[in-house]
Amino acid sequence: MFSNSNIGLLLFITHTLSAITVGILLGLLARLKHKLKNNIFAHSYNSSTNELCTFNNLGSILSNAILESSKTIIMIGGFVVIFSVIISILGNSKILEIFSYLLYIPLKLLNIDLSFAKPIISGIIELTNGVLLVSSVTSKAISFNIIICAFLLGFGGISVLLQVLSITSKSDLSIKKYIYGKLLQGIIAAIYTYILINLIPMFFLNL
């Protein structure tokens, strides 16, 4: 994407740190809201052990696992293709450009080039195409490109959120909490990226 191993290492470090940070913050928040019962882990362990004891057909379990994983891979590929087509349609119809006007004021306040507006909207919709567009923008400092990419990689985009929703829809997991967590991860990843670029010489990429 940037053809620079230092940038790849930088994004890896910041996203690892941001994921850990979000995990710690959400864990602390959950402890504040709910008092954990002493026997909850024992109950979960016993129930899972009982379920494992009822599985007699290993071949059936493996075939079902392979089938479900294959379906998931096809589904993810389908989401990427569909959202790539959507971005192309929105771009050709100038609708994407209209949406990009919403970012003009925030970008001006942050002293970021307005040419990032359309790529950011694309990245919010679909991650892969968005980060490629952001990385290709010519700006006064490449650090802007990297920080924006860090945010988009942390957030994941609407396409990724819908992929997760399609997988977790049959569970009791809260998609709202996941969205808030991903948004928080994107913001924290961008902050960590800014800090590392300005504090560590090997990541000083403003030149």
Predicted regions and their residues:
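Short, mixed-charge, low-aromatic patches
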Residues: 19, 23, 56-62, 118-122
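Intrinsically disordered, low-complexity non-transmembrane regions of multi-pass membrane transporters
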Residues: 32-68, 207
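Transmembrane alpha-helical segments of multi-pass membrane transport proteins and ion-pumping complexes
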Residues: 19-31, 72, 76, 80, ...
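Transmembrane helical segments that form the transport core of multi-pass membrane transport proteins
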Residues: 62, 66-147
